[in-house]
Amino acid sequence: MISCTEFILAYNELFKFLHEKYGKDSVIDFWEYISDNFLQNLENLVREKGIAGMAEYWTHTLTEEKAEYQMSVGENCFEIYMKKCPSVGLLNKSKAVKYPHYCEHCILYKKIIEKYGFAYEENIIDKERGICLLKVVRKD
C-alpha cells in the first residue's frame, strides 16, 4: 500500500496544474470531489463515533505522516494544533514550487464533519512553516 506522504508531491503538482489551466475554483472542485468520493473511512468514523471517530482518524493519519501536532479531544470539542505539517515540510525540502494555496486543501474535511452536526473551523497560522489549527465543535 502506498503511504499518504507519497502523494504529497503529486497532489501539489496537480493543484498547480488545475489552477493554471482552469483557475482556483477547479482546485476547490477537485477537493470537493475527493471529499465526496474518497473519505468514506472518515465519514463512517464520524457518523458512528462522532468526536471519538475524528480522533481515531487523525491519530492514524498524522502518525503515518509523522506530523508534529497536539490533539485535544473533549465531549463537544476536537482540536488539532499542527506544529509542523509534514506535507509542507516535504514540499519545502523538495525542489518543487509549492502551490500557494496548498494548505487550504484541508477544507475537504469540512463537508463531512458538518454533515453530522459539528462546526468546522480552520485557521492557517503560517503556511510557510506548516502551522495551523483545526477546531471542531458540536452544534447544540
Give short role names for the model-derived ranges:
Residues 101-111:
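ATP phosphate-binding glycine-rich loop and adjacent ATP-lid/helix-beta elements
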Residues 17, 109-112, 116:
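Conserved short hydrophobic interaction patches
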Residues 1-79, 84-102, 119-133, 138-140:
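N-terminal accessory segment detector
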